[in-house]
Amino acid sequence: MHPIAAVEAEMSLWSTDILHNDIAKTCAELDIPVIAYSPLGRGVLTGSVTSLADIPDGDIRHHMSRFQEENFKHNMKLINEVNELATRRGVAPAQIALAWIRTQSNKPGMPTIIPIPGGTTKDKVVQNMGGAQALADSEMAEIEAILEEHTVSGARY
């Protein structure tokens, strides 16, 4: 039998569960990398979703708890603060979201974390590959404060 080569788990500023439920810790202890899917929070961390009207009719997100009106309104507080940080840094919000994951990966006691963002255009793929590769300690502290202040409302699915 082949040993586990990687663990695929949802991870983003929108979904930090693996940092709190011992998945990341266990992967680090066993030297198993994490493949972080949906690192852009189903698109909300790209800066292109500012209201529910930005999500096309028939999109599955309309059926997800985090995208219901009250939850979405609350969750936009987190998104707006991430967008402000991106603006100050001169990068796209998606680059901040991906850099946060890369920086988590470099912390002691964390596994290697490989984000796998989607890209609907060549420009988005290029954008996701560039920009903010890692965040400064002060930026990480700012993001941690944002996450503590604005807990995401609604279940993942």
Residue ranges and their predicted role:
Residues 1-148, 152-156:
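Beta/alpha (TIM)-barrel catalytic core signal, keyed to glycine-rich beta->alpha loops juxtaposed to Asp/Glu
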